[in-house]
Amino acid sequence: MERFRIIDLPKIVDPRGNLTVAEQMKNIPFGIARVYWTYDVPSGERRGGHAHRTCEEIVIAVSGSFDVTVDDGRGHKEVYHLNHPYQGLYIGTGVWRTLEDFSSGAVCLVLASELFDEDEYIYEYDEFLEWAASPSPSQGGSV
């Protein structure tokens, strides 16, 4: 089971402007419980810096670009450069993520499988590594 990967969303090209659609349980592999976005990120700042115990997410650069580093805590780490509004990065449960190198005017849209719950976040990297090293039925995700 892939813990993170690029998902191509449909891109409908039209001379009046392009359109991309995200539909839960169709091209988004989970039910969408929460949508949020970050914008006006100052140069050099980072976002993220945490993992989710139970929440899955799709991260989309709806405008501009930024890099997302994902880490499964078991030696598999990748950096994705997001710059297309018709592509999303699926991040399953139990994956540490850091977002950085935001371009001017970048907007990061996130589709989440769960409502906000402070208790399901892991904010300390060392705690994340310990958690990732122990087998857990909540690790994985829909993809």
Feature locations, PLM:
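Well-ordered alpha/beta subsegment
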Residues: 84-89, 93-101
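Non-catalytic, conserved peripheral segments adjacent to functional cores
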Residues: 1-87, 104-107, 111, 116-138, ...
